[in-house]
Amino acid sequence: IVAGAAKGLKSLDIKTAIDTIHRTHVTDRNGLLWKIKTIAQEVSAIAYQFDEFKTSKRKNQGFNKLTFLVNDTSEGKKMSAACKETSGLIQGIDLAKNLANRPANICTPTHLAEVSISLAESNDNLTTQVLEELDMEKLKMGALLSVSKGSREPAKFIIIKYAAENPSQAKPVVLVGKGVTFDSGGISLKGGAGMDEMKYDMGGAAAVLGSMLAVSIIRPEIDVIGVIPATENLPDGNASKPGDIVTSMSGQTIEILNTDAEGRMILCDALAYAEQFDPEAIIDIATLTGACVVALGEHATGLLSNDDNLSNDLLTSGTRSGDRAWRLPLWPEYHKQIESPFADMANVGGRAAGTITAACFLSKFTKNMAWAHLDIAGTAWKSGIQKGATGRPVPMLVDYIQSKALDRNCDED
């Protein structure tokens, strides 16, 4: 109903609309906040247009105001709070979309760092820090630097923090987003078909920045930290070669069998770095494997975790927000596929169970933390006539963060 109405309004170039659909009874989904979020997200998704680089803007710019009718003052207060929360979420989703849709010559690692700095300057509850390659060398981030060495664009390591107004003594939630702003595959070069879409390989980083913006507006009572390793993956005379062995920040050695498995290389150093925050939970988000697209298509994000409670919470948030995930196993048998005769591990484990073996690799850097991995290779963007970023999994992440804040408040009461 909502999608049909929104498409009709857009086609008629109507700028404002009044909603009464939120009064409709929905079985098992009758909460006001859920209805407002669902309606506003659907309308926003249809109204969204990415035309930053169009010299002639589209005539139909879509509507820009949605009004919800209320019965009384009490309902109005609830509606106002719901609208503010929903507005924050939509702004976060749109930021994630805009970042991912920008071309790789614009959205470089430096650009991601600049956006993070801008967010901190515009929001008093956000702070940011950007590490340069020299800093990464001092931290011995050999895995991340093995990817960036093939590009003339300097890598950036971004830390962005949200500080709650009245934080509890509980630990923060940490989000780690893969920020490969263009992925050619490196020396293990990808085929040319569809390579333009490899600008979307920073979808994890976009989701982290979008989530941090949303959180800064919604202001849940929980500290959140975003960590983004940002780089390009390109081939030149200095690029890593298949067979190279590097030492990660954790001290573990990695045999690089495929330079196109670079996402896990930059994430492993980011995960090792994030351990210093002693997080309650750490969630990495990455367009990591084509195998996940084969397994789950474009509808469900792949979820793998070493913690059942964290996994169940994310699955619940995915269902509640309409941004669903499906859990895959991390059984010991799969770990054997990434064994190396020359190093502590290999960065790939063959064609079979590619999504799982990639997560097995990451799990070796999260042994002391409750950790979840979200593989968004199938859900971060769409191809074809609807080509463009989706903003996922910002809705799931924001819902999870809000639910953890509410859980803590209940515990303290």
Where is each model-derived feature located?
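Short amphipathic alpha-helical segment within the helicase RecA-like ATPase core
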Residues: I1-G179
